Amino acid sequence: MADLEEQLSDEEKVRIAAKFIIHAPPGEFNEVFNDVRLLLNNDNLLREGAAHAFAQYNLDQFTPVKIEGYEDQVLITEHGDLGNGKFLDPKNRICFKFDHLRKEATDPRPYEAENTVESWRTSVETALRAYVKEHYPNGVCTVYGKKIDGQQTIIACIESHQFQAKNFWNGRWRSEWKFTISPSSTQVVGILKIQVHYYEDGNVQLVSHKDIQDSLTVSNEAQTAKEFIKIVEAAENEYQTAISENYQTMSDTTFKALRRQLPVTRTKIDWNKILSYKIGKEMQNA
């Protein structure tokens, strides 16, 4: 092991450490970071070389953050990334600095985003917040409005998590929805993601995703937002139901087949008793 460690360059060590960090299960970033820190045994190398991994993890996980002085949390996503460690909170029209390692937001300042799509963004955000409040008690959503390739685009992100370290499991739901504002109708594209880690007496992870496409009728802002939420609700309910049904099927069939079956006698074998019989028989023969 020591020889292998000597053969690895600092660059290779950082690359391996970054992979561990990026793939840390939800709610377990600190544990993975601390383990990697011990293995690498070079804090400066880790902080400088793996800084991109800290950022990538937060962007991928839709990490929610609370900004001092503001009521609602905002998600850290690629859509709100303004560069140089700054992110956008479109609801409060502010930008802020975000520390990817400490997961802290600081220095909030006013920020004016795309005004041409703001009324559409606000309508979708209002409808989505009501939906999230009903379906995800601990959920957070952030809605962006921006021009992409010259088209007015709405991007809606949802995150909800349950971290139960005392019960040896953590899980996170993420969904991202996108559509352009065009006359008559448009295409809604979404991706739904579930990641759960269970680690009591074992190590089991569920990592699942589903891509969604649907048509959306575009009329006025309020009605379009309402129709958009119907698509979101139907797709997310269907996906979550399918996941639950698959787990039940696996429990009834696949996992059951893995369990050790009882012998023909339908009773468990008492190996201690069999051993004592064998010893007794050998003593008699002696």
Swiss-Prot record:
Cite the InterPro entries for this sequence: CapZ_alpha, CapZ_alpha/beta, CapZ_alpha/beta_2, CapZ_alpha_1, F-actin_cap_asu_CS
**GO BP terms:** actin cytoskeleton organization; barbed-end actin filament capping
Q: Which UniProt keywords apply?
A: Acetylation, Actin capping, Actin-binding, Phosphoprotein
Known role: F-actin-capping proteins bind in a Ca(2+)-independent manner to the fast growing ends of actin filaments (barbed end) thereby blocking the exchange of subunits at these ends. Unlike other capping proteins (such as gelsolin and severin), these proteins do not sever actin filaments.
Name of the protein: F-actin-capping protein subunit alpha-2
Per its record, what are the GO molecular function terms?
actin filament binding
Homology family:
Belongs to the F-actin-capping protein alpha subunit family.
**Residue list for modification Phosphoserine:** S9
Q: Keyword Acetylation, does the record have it?
A: yes
Q: Locate the N-acetylalanine modifications and list their residues.
A: A2
Annotated TM spans: none
Annotated GO CC locations: cortical cytoskeleton; F-actin capping protein complex
How does this polypeptide assemble, per the annotation? Component of the F-actin capping complex, composed of a heterodimer of an alpha and a beta subunit. Component of the WASH complex, composed of F-actin-capping protein subunit alpha (CAPZA1, CAPZA2 or CAPZA3), F-actin-capping protein subunit beta (CAPZB), WASHC1, WASHC2, WASHC3, WASHC4 and WASHC5. Interacts with RCSD1/CAPZIP.
